[in-house]
């Protein structure tokens, strides 16, 4: 029998729905008993920081458009690596990737690092945020981005 698992999540209705869905799927499909542990933000962050969890619902939105924005979060001593996971080869590949000016070589090194991450699975990506946009063709200078930040300085109307 698989031992009972706890899923830690912070107080937020969307996070609660995700935790409930995981609980239901794991119990129904895998027969794993899952206890949901809801904590306010400060307690949740503290428990994550000290590693006081079995499974934790966390999130990350890439703050720049590059694979490194996600890969770098799982290096040791990074503020977002709450997993305790470390892999020297992974770290070495990221160091090499970030020290080369050869784009093809860099992406190959990042791909090798990502393969290690996929093989060892210290995290389980569940979903990505999506947004729907409807813009007039007259709107110029507006480009979708991960953080959904749009400086009005660069957005303007241009009528044909």
Regions inferred by a protein language model and the residue ranges of each:
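Ligand/substrate-recognition segments at binding pockets and active sites
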Residues: 1-62, 103, 131
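A glycine-rich, aromatic-flanked flexible loop/lid motif
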Residues: 60-64, 83-86
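Short, solvent-exposed loop/beta-turn-alpha elements that line the ligand-binding surface or hinge
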Residues: 1, 47-51, 69-99, 128-160
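Sec-exported extracytoplasmic/periplasmic mature domains
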Residues: 24-32, 49-53, 76, 95-105, ...
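Extracytoplasmic/secreted proteins, especially bacterial periplasmic and envelope-associated proteins
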Residues: 14-25, 43, 66-69, 89-96, ...
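Preference for short coil/turn "hinge" residues that link or interrupt alpha-helices
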Residues: 37, 64, 78, 116-119, ...
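Conserved, well-structured core segments
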Residues: 125
């Amino acid at each position: 029998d698989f031992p009972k698992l706890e899923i830690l999540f912070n107080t937020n209705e969307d996070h609660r729905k995700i935790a409930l869905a995981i609980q239901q799927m794991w119990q129904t499909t895998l027969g794993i008993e899952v206890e949901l542990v809801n904590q306010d933000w400060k307690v949740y962050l503290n428990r994550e920081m000290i590693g006081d969890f079995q499974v934790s619902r966390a999130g990350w939105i890439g703050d720049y458009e590059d694979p490194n924005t996600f890969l770098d979060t799982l290096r040791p001593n990074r503020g977002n690596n709450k997993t305790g996971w470390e892999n020297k080869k992974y770290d070495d590949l990221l160091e090499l990737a970030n020290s080369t000016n050869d784009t093809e070589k860099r992406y190959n090194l990042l791909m090798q690092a990502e393969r290690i991450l996929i093989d060892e699975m210290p995290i389980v990506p569940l979903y990505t945020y999506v947004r729907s946009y409807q813009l007039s063709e007259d709107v110029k200078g507006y480009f979708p981005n991960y953080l959904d930040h749009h400086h009005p300085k660069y957005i303007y109307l241009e009528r044909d």
